[in-house]
């Protein structure tokens, strides 16, 4: 308390801080040397406290005694170490600006201040007592600690749950892998048995057929030898000059027996395969059918799984001459992912497209707003043929010029054949419709879902074919094609279109604008 009173007596009345280089006026009042000179420059030479004029010609003199006292006060008296004062403020802490004890906390500047700061720099700031500010901060820290502990408890619980789920996934994956391995082992074993049995049956049938062929060959050789001997004997008789001998021996000459028909060999491919051919076809169909394999997602997702090779065009045991002639210009095509509507999902190396209810997201600038997709290849010259398999009716097949609109312009759900720059065939449940320039021609329906498209740019013909159960032309467009043509398709929700490929056929690898000749 005495030290605080002493500091108040040693405070300059102008700056309210401890004297700095103290000087004494003739009236007896003391001030900082710099403070009094600044005061006189602004207010005239007079004492700031008693207003006594300062005589002209007099000089300010430094108060040596007061300066010594200030040095002792600033150094501070030596204190004996006492008990730990606890977590309160350090009583020796002083304001770095004014050298006075820190008594308040300035919330505006976020620091401890002295009494001088409160009447000068922090006069308009929000202030609080040190103990009150400490209580407030302690409450905030305790609340933060409680929230942190709750988060730690929650994180530990989530970590335990995550470990539990990971363990369950590992166990489930092991069980599934074991089950799948067992099923595939049984399937492979059954296939191996069927394979061995089928090969053995074919080998037995081949051995029997070849043995029959050898018997027939031996019979024919014996007959050939008898015929040769008979011919040789006839030539000998013809050279006989004695008429009596000729007549007698010619009567004794016996011709060889009749040859008889060739016995058909007991070999029938259909009989050898039997039900195995149908079984293998159904099995391959189940394995290659989209979504039938174990673990396939119920709905399409954005991931890109490893795809199996695309389907090949079905080759019947006997191909009609018309279709075999069309195959001479066969083209292996792929769908263009950029043009696909946002509800279309491509698979099998872009050979198959499916219309799903779930959207892949917003479409790109080159995608159709309508339920359509086009191929990645286009044609400007030459003769081209391709085949498409539809899962059901309500699909449209066609070709178009590059300027086919991507957006919906009218009431129709597609724009294939609705204008002058496209030609299309709409496959409905009970009929067909050939569309061009907004006009449609109704045609009888077809039962098969395998269709062919033949484009002859030189003659200006676009012909659609039905390939099941037999090959027959459906409709032919005649036009003067003067721009590149791109195959384009429309399909209803739930429908699937597959571009069939032929081994050895031309497979254009260029971009969409590539011109094939």
Curated annotation (Swiss-Prot):
Chief place of localization: cytoplasm
GO biological process, one term: protein K48-linked ubiquitination
Ranges in a coiled coil: 139-227
Modified residues (N-acetylalanine): 2
SMART domains: BBOX, RING, SPRY
Phosphoserine: modified positions: 185
Residue sites binding Zn(2+) per the record: 95, 98, 117, 125
Protein keywords: Acetylation, Coiled coil, Cytoplasm, Immunity, Innate immunity, Isopeptide bond, Metal-binding, Phosphoprotein, Transferase, Ubl conjugation, Zinc, Zinc-finger
Stretches the record annotates as Disordered: 75-94
Annotated GO MF terms: ubiquitin protein ligase activity; zinc ion binding
Protein name: E3 ubiquitin-protein ligase TRIM65
Organism whose genome encodes this protein: Homo sapiens
